[in-house]
Design a protein with these regions (language model features):
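Pyridoxal 5′-phosphate
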Residues: 1-341
Length: 341
């Protein structure tokens, strides 16, 4: 066996073609170069590549938002650094938004990174990434957790978002298998990161003991072996592309808005998140009176309806995240079951 599987030319060429093709597909979706796409196991992998790869000193600081309102994967890796650097947390409102002036006031000459989720896993709020990048003005490295946006809010263009790094998942909105993820690393910005995992794919030895990292994507590609998952993600993403990402956005927002309208007819129901549909994904978080979210999840599962229990400020709530395969009839069936509670 070698890094691409069995020692077979046919197998090696097949896997290499899959690797090359998925990078081209993702590069087209986010408007970058194929070599800037690193294959990972999850969004979390990409976040940790950045958190563990940047160089800091004792005067350094990074800026995050939300703390307990943030997804753990885009919170814990930064908090782990708190004994080495200053972690500056932006105050937020009930929907997870922060004031841009607060971001400006927290930036100084020692700010090494701003790390922000593009959209929030609990409220569905879409943060103003382009306004944030304009403030940073290519002077401060910018990391975006796009796990909740790639595949559900239409076309992306990293050149407009002006981010240095972006991580997202293959098994959420891209509908691929578990264990698939993508990490975008701007070619020039790759010089800011030192890999913390090294293997034969990522480096070479010169002059007997001088370790030289390879160029992108190999520099960060150590140990990836989920070729079966990769083939599945290639198929799922191709289907989404054929449907059209903007068409998908239109469809799922119709479902989301339908649910909000219908659940609003239940007196004890409450919906969380922005009212303006341009400020949110199709995610809808809600509660139905004092009913236990865990019990509701179980009751609906018995009816063949899958919803999730999540948290907003450590408060348990229910969440739906309709996607392209869902229908209006399914939304109406969900609401009818909620009325029976």
């Amino acid at each position: 066996y070698n890094s691409l599987g069995p020692d077979s030319k046919d197998s090696e060429l097949f896997v290499a073609e899959k690797l090359d093709n998925i990078r081209k597909i993702i590069a087209k979706i986010i408007c970058c170069k194929p070599e800037e796409v690193i294959l990972t196991q999850s969004t979390t992998d990409g976040i940790n590549i950045v958190a563990n790869g940047l160089s800091f000193d004792n005067t350094s600081n990074i800026i995050i938002r939300g703390m307990t309102h943030e997804h753990h994967s885009n919170f814990y890796p930064w908090i782990k650094l708190k004994d080495r650097i200053s972690i500056r947390n932006l105050p937020i409102d009930d929907n997870g938004f922060f004031e841009l002036d607060d971001l400006k006031s927290n930036i100084d000459n020692n700010t090494k990174l701003v790390a922000i989720s593009h959209a929030l896993y609990n409220t569905g709020s879409i943060l103003p990434i382009e306004k944030i990048s304009k403030i940073l003005d290519n002077e401060i490295p910018f990391f975006i957790d796009s796990a909740q946006t790639i595949g559900c809010i239409g076309e992306h263009d990293v050149s407009k978002l002006k981010c240095n790094f972006m991580s997202f998942n293959g098994s959420k909105w891209l509908c691929g298998p578990m264990g698939t993820g993508l990490f975008y690393c701007n070619r020039k910005s790759s010089e800011l990161l030192e890999p913390k995992t090294i293997g034969g794919e990522s480096a070479i030895i010169k002059n007997d003991n001088d370790l030289i990292f390879k160029d992108l994507p190999d520099k960060f590609q150590t140990g990836f072996r989920n070729y079966v998952g990769l083939a599945g993600m290639e198929s799922s993403v191709t289907i989404l592309q054929n449907l059209g990402l903007d068409n998908i956005r239109k469809h799922i927002m119709e479902l989301s808005n339908l649910f909000i309208d219908e659940i609003g007819k239940i007196p004890e129901a409450r919906v969380f998140g922005p009212e303006n549909e341009n400020e949110r994904t199709s995610i809808v978080s809600f509660e139905v009176g004092k009913n236990d979210p865990e019990k509701i999840v179980s009751a609906l599962a018995e009816k063949g309806i899958i919803v999730a229990k999540r948290e907003i400020y450590e408060k348990p709530i229910l969440r739906i995240s309709p996607h392209v395969f869902n229908t209006k009839d399914e939304i109406l069936k969900l609401v009818e079951e909620l009325k029976k509670l």
